[in-house]
Amino acid sequence: MRLNAEFLSQVPSFISPLKETELDLRWYQIPIIENLGVLRDVHDAIDFTDNDIRYLGNFPRMKRLQTLLCGNNRITAIAPDIGKVLPNLKTLSLAQNHLQEIADLDPLASCPQLTNLSCIDNPVAQKQYYRLYLIWRIPSLHILDFERVRRNERLRAEEVFGQIQNPTEIASSIMGVKSRVFDLAALVQSHPEANSPITTGYTLTPEEREKIKEAIKNASSIAEINRLEAMLLEGKIPK
């Protein structure tokens, strides 16, 4: 199911037990987040539980949104601008997804209001330093995986990882390991048809596909690869 304007206009909203205006997008097999600008930022919460989303990104600026439920999807990457476009996000559920490395969660450090985060049943949750690193990297957190963040954990995190501006070797080593979550060339080649799930509203021309493949081939760093991943999944073409 694609998130087009007609579909979004028919999706039910309701007042949740937390007194939030919530949009219910559960169980629609949604592959990509798109076209949310038509909602006009009138929701406090959006529930994307039980879909097929792989990339947590492509949001318009939504100042009202405080709760985002994305459990049981296929998410492997988070947009680096998530804190900029969702500045008041407080609660985020990423339970039962495919997040692999601790540094894959680094974009959440840009969310200044994030107090409640769940990443249980992701491979990353089994990593050494997972909990301690997130407490250090996201100082606003009060609850992580349904457990309250304690003062002694904050002190221990600072002891292990140092200051954000001056991280220890352990912190730097964690920051340097990020999943190469997609083979972009394979994605482009495997979705040549119109209305591909990796685009947002138009078909890639042969020239655009070649441009993307050339950009991938010339990428010189993981950061550049990640930038190209984000551009492709948001339907943007490298210049």
From Swiss-Prot:
Any Pfam family matching the protein: LRR_9
InterPro entries the record matches: Leu-rich_rpt, LRR_dom_sf, RU2A
UniProtKB keywords: Leucine-rich repeat, mRNA processing, mRNA splicing, Nucleus, Repeat, Spliceosome
Span of domain LRRCT: 122-160
Highest taxon of source: Eukaryota
Principal cellular location given in the protein's record: nucleus
Gene Ontology CC annotations of this record: cytosol; nucleus; post-mRNA release spliceosomal complex; spliceosomal complex; U2 snRNP; U2-type prespliceosome
Sequence ranges of the LRR repeats: 19-40, 42-63, 64-85, 88-109
GO molecular function, one term: U2 snRNA binding
A single GO BP: mRNA cis splicing, via spliceosome
Function of the molecule: Involved in pre-mRNA splicing. This protein is associated with sn-RNP U2. It helps the A' protein to bind stem loop IV of U2 snRNA.
Name of protein: U2 small nuclear ribonucleoprotein A'
